[in-house]
Amino acid sequence: MAIREILTVPDPILKEVSQPVDQVDDDLRELMDDMLQTMYAADGIGLAAIQVGVPKRVIVMDLAGSDEEAKPRYFVNPVLSDPSDTLKPYEEGCLSVPTVYDEIERPDRIHIQYLDYDGNECEEIAEGMFAVCIQHEMDHLEGVLFIDYLSRLKRQRAVQKVKKVEKSKDRDAA
């Protein structure tokens, strides 16, 4: 397993639409393992393959709390349907938009179909934080970031903030 670089805004790769996966094989499982390791190293709860520069429809997630045992989840070619009419606001953040958080409204319940780590077909109802996280990560697969839901001014400020943080990191590393 390897920790991969997480792309940050304004990297244009993050705006690409991810492509479906043909099959779940050892190469894909290696990608998912790397993604999970990368997500854990960055203290995240979800990561889409496009965030590590791989435009495939793959998501990893772990919503276990810091005091709980890890509960990794893998979603290959996920499809969302039947969102609830009830929207709930949640404060969201993103590993590709570090240090930026804002409230986003999303359906609080949604149906999801996907292939798991072993290529098995699965479906379930996502609710609460799981629903928020899967919708957030699904947006990545469509080239959408959570800041795209914000006003133009807030979005511009977010990108500037990330650029400043990244520049500071680069300066510190030099």
Swiss-Prot record:
Q: Which reaction does it catalyse?
A: N-terminal N-formyl-L-methionyl-[peptide] + H2O = N-terminal L-methionyl-[peptide] + formate
Q: Top enzyme class of this protein?
A: hydrolase
Q: Which cofactors must be present for this protein to function? A: Fe(2+)
Q: Could you say which residues bind Fe cation here?
A: C94, H136, H140
SUPFAM superfamilies of this UniProt entry? Answer: Peptide deformylase
Q: Which terms does the UniProt entry file under GO BP? A: co-translational protein modification; translation
Q: What is this protein called?
A: Peptide deformylase
Q: Which organism is it from?
A: Maricaulis maris (strain MCS10)
Q: What is the lineage of its organism?
A: Bacteria, Pseudomonadati, Pseudomonadota, Alphaproteobacteria, Maricaulales
Q: Could you tell me the gene encoding this protein?
A: def
